[in-house]
């Protein structure tokens, strides 16, 4: 039944997938020589709108990917096991506010840098996730394509946020130094159950953080329009 539901969902999403890809506005800021020279020509307002749209799409696709993975590879007892085992997200140690009151109190500068930290923290883990999903028997192309798409769009989002920091805060371009995790450098192959639970945790945590990126960026947009009405 789970497999049938997953297939139904995959067919439905496949029909919408081309529209999802074409609906997003381009955000690629990097020229072929590696310089971030495209986005600086876009107005600050339009760039923020594009960054928000990218964050919205990334969250939506991450939500679909997590649900598809869950339906195909994670029976309900294992879903409960993950919740009870207390798996932690890789970004838990980052100094990023999580409560509504904390988020409302932070500055625009910290909002942007919080988004950038989240984005950069997930670039390398998503590359790992692409590689490990390729080893799954029966992993649908839809899931593989979604993971690859999110990974590529996350890099575009990073570029957009970096330029946005330059425009809004008049700061130099932030360096993109990734905090490598030993979790993704272990050459030993975990057993299938361990691999499934680890990948499920990654997808679930990324979905949560992608939503947080979207919320922070939309709060920033609200502040640009009317700082007193942003809840």
UniProtKB/Swiss-Prot annotation:
It is found in: Secreted. Residues 1-24 form the signal peptide. Glycans are attached at residues 35, 145. Pfam families: Hormone_1 (PF00103). Pituitary gland. The keyword Phosphoprotein does not apply. One of its GO terms (molecular function) is growth hormone activity. Belongs to the somatotropin/prolactin family. This is Somatolactin.
């Amino acid at each position: 039944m789970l497999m049938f539901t997953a297939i139904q969902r995959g067919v439905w999403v496949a029909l919408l997938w081309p529209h999802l890809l074409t609906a997003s506005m381009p955000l690629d800021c990097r020229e072929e020589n590696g310089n971030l020279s495209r986005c600086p020509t876009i107005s600050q307002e339009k760039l923020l709108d594009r960054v928000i749209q990218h964050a919205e799409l990334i969250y939506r696709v991450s939500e679909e990917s997590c649900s598809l993975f869950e339906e195909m590879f994670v029976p309900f007892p294992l879903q409960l096991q993950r919740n009870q085992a207390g798996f932690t997200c890789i970004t838990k140690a980052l100094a990023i506010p999580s409560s509504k009151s904390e988020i409302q109190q932070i500055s625009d500068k910290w909002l942007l840098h919080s988004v950038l930290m989240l984005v950069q923290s997930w670039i390398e883990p998503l590359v790992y996730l692409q590689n490990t999903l390729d080893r799954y028997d029966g992993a649908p192309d839809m899931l593989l394509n979604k993971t690859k798409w999110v990974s590529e769009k996350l890099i575009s989002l990073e570029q957009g946020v970096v330029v946005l920091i330059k425009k809004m805060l008049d700061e130099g371009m932030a360096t993109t130094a990734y905090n490598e995790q030993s979790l993704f450098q272990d050459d030993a192959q975990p057993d299938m159950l361990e691999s499934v639970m680890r990948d499920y945790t990654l997808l679930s945590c990324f979905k949560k953080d992608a939503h947080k990126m979207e919320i922070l960026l939309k709060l920033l947009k609200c502040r640009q329009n009317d700082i007193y009405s942003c809840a």
